[in-house]
Amino acid sequence: MKPTYKILVTLISVSIFTTACKKQAPVCTSNCGTINANGNVINKQTNTNALGVPVSLSWVKFVGGFSQKEVIATVNSKIDGSFNFTSNIDTTYFSKGYFLSLSVGKSNDYIVLGYSGLIETRTYVFDQNAFQAKQFEVYKKANLKLKLNRTLKDNFKSYAIAHANVGDFYLHNYNVQSPQEVLDRNTSEINIETVADVYTKIKTVKTFANGTSTTTLDSIRCTTNSTSIYNIIF
């Protein structure tokens, strides 16, 4: 049986692999093989069809911790969430260390969460049936603005802000090393894309020079078509 891999990608604040190069793959002129990709994209939160989400077929290779990507084709999911397209690929790419990736991306209305939901599937050999009846999972997008208000006079060592939306996987959004750095950065607002219609948890940790710390945990329910605002006073 030819190997095809479904990928549940874990996103962390500092990614192990970084996309170094992304470009359009050249049109195949020799050693071509035809491959069809079809399936559907759903909103994982509601198990309903997701319209207008980009699905891409790409060559990917990791070199020294960086990825090289050549996009072969991209289509958007239809009103019923489906996608179906056929591409000619240069099969010699497999012998050059590339694998073939079918992945879903974010759109104006949806975001991808690599730590929750299938967003990519791969094949490392030419297999015309590798990308049949695939289902990708995305989440409805909501916009959240964190407003930072430095009003206290305490002298902290570091101040970290993180958020979580589905589960307890926290993404770090901001970390400063001193009160003065807040002023130096001149950062008063942080814009976040989060999941709509669920409670986004906001966690702050203030650490002092003596090793003690204080933690706050709160949440806000964000909706689509508007920007929710959460004020952080520290």
Model-derived segments and spans:
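Short Pro-Gly-centered beta-turn/loop motif in secreted/extracellular proteins
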Residues: I79-F99, Q180-K203
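Extracellular beta-sheet/turn segments enriched in Thr/Pro/Gly and aliphatic residues
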Residues: V27, Y115-K145, S213-F234
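Post-signal-peptide N-terminal segment of Sec-exported extracytoplasmic proteins
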Residues: N36-S82
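Sec-dependent bacterial lipoprotein signal peptides
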Residues: M1-K22
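A short, solvent-exposed loop/turn motif at the edges and junctions
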Residues: D90-D127, K206-T215
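Short, ordered, surface-exposed loop/turn motifs in non-cytosolic proteins
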Residues: T46-G65, L152-H172
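Beta-strand-rich domain onsets/edges
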Residues: C21-N36, N40-Q45, A130-K141
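Short, acidic Ser/Thr/Gly-rich low-complexity loop/linker segments typical of extracellular
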Residues: G64-N88, Y170-R185
